């Protein structure tokens, strides 16, 4: 049995015994058209600064998110700074939360804070196979006997709650008693449901200050829930990049505890596209510029005897370096994650996720 098969077998056993916890990241919600946190911040920032001129574009949120993505590829400003500037723009907490709700669910609304807020569970699952597979795992659960023990989500949205429909669940975004017989869904960064009646900013983690405040409070309900779950059940992380600093800190703390942990993460295998001839030529020219710099500095005086600029072997040399770095990079990522007590389950295509999740129920 290879490592991946062993991981899936462990997840199946945990599900059968009712001891499997799910950790959901932005990758789960993007399949339904919701923005990731970085695009959410920029889209809110753009529309806040140009509210009147951008109002017609609220009818076409895809353009706002596409522009945010374009800006992300070119901006050097840390998003934490942008988020802080955005928050300072709003004097009224209610206005900020309404704008966050409108931007988060822009694809569900008609641009005027109304729209399709009554979504059929079947429709939302068929349009997002990963969410559909997660929903099936939750629906197959019997509290205390089999299935999912709890869901910890780092997303604001209520897509899973909508998909679960009449299955008994409890959405939790602050310290509160657990309801017996209901699947707990912990929103540790806050909860902004689609069918909203009241939004409170103190319940969400949005700015860098709020993030640090949440991270440093070791006894906050959110941190305690995560530590208890990471150390007391088998965990599967879905749609998470594993780059969240607070989560890595918690994983590191749990890995030092005198308990046996069993956590897994579904991660896309890094793909390094081979450079095209033009890119290879640019890399070669850059390498030559370094050699010339060495010669001028006097650090290397015999490079011409060991390096032939007319030799075409540099193509293979560059490609072999890239391939070796790629191979070692995957191994190193696996090693670092396992040091944190997380066993990666690599996949090549996102279409594999629903299949892997479905196999847990088999």
Regions found by a protein language model. Name each.
Residues 11, 15, 99-109, 116, ...:
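Generic hydrophobic, helix-prone segments enriched in Leu/Val/Ile
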Residues 25, 134, 155, 188, ...:
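A residue-level signal for conserved active-site and pocket-lining positions in enzyme catalytic cores
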Residues 159-162, 194-198, 244-245:
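Short, well-ordered, mixed-charge alpha-helical segments that flank or form enzyme active sites
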Residues 4, 124-127, 216-219, 244:
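A conditional alpha-helix N-cap/helix-loop micro-motif detector
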Residues 1-22, 28-32, 37-38, 42-43, ...:
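SIR2/sirtuin-family catalytic core signature
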Residues 28-30, 158, 192:
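Conserved nucleotide-binding/hydrolysis micro-motifs of P-loop NTPases
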Residues 76-168:
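Ligand-binding beta-strand-loop-alpha-helix segment within the catalytic cores
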Residues 113-120, 166-231:
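Active-site gating loop/helix substructures
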């Amino acid at each position: 049995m290879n490592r991946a098969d062993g991981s899936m077998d462990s997840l199946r056993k945990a599900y059968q015994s009712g001891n499997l916890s799910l950790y959901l990241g932005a990758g789960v919600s993007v399949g339904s058209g919701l923005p990731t946190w970085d695009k959410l911040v920029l889209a809110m920032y753009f529309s806040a600064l140009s509210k009147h001129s951008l109002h017609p574009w609220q009818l076409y949120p895809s353009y706002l998110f596409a522009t945010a993505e374009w800006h992300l590829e070119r901006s050097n400003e840390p998003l934490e700074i942008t988020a802080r500037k955005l928050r300072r723009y709003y004097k009224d907490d209610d206005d900020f939360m309404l704008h966050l709700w409108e931007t988060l669910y822009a694809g569900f609304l008609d641009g005027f804070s109304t729209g399709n807020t009554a979504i059929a569970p079947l429709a939302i699952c068929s349009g997002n196979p990963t969410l559909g597979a997660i929903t099936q795992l939750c629906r197959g659960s019997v509290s205390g006997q089999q299935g999912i023990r709890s869901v910890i989500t780092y997303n604001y949205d209520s897509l899973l709650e909508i998909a679960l429909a009449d299955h008994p669940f409890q959405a939790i975004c602050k310290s509160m008693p657990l309801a017996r017989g209901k699947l707990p869904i912990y929103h540790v960064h806050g909860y902004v449901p689609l069918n909203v009646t009241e939004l409170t900013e103190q319940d969400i983690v949005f700015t860098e200050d709020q993030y640090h405040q949440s991270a440093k409070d070791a006894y906050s309900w959110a941190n305690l829930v995560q530590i208890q779950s990471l150390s007391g059940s088998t965990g599967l992380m879905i749609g998470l990049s594993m780059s969240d600093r607070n989560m890595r800190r918690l994983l590191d703390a749990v890995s030092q505890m005198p308990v046996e942990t069993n956590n897994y993460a579904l991660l896309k295998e890094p793909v390094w596209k081979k450079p095209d001839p033009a890119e290879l030529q640019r890399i070669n020219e850059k390498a030559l510029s370094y050699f010339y710099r060495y010669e001028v500095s006097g650090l290397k005086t015999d490079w011409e005897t060991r390096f032939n600029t007319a030799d075409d072997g540099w193509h293979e040399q560059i490609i072999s370096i890239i391939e070796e770095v790629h191979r070692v990079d995957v191994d190193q990522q696996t090693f670092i994650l396992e040091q944190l007590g997380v066993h990666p389950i690599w996949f090549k295509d996102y279409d594999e996720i629903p299949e892997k999740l479905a196999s847990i129920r088999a």
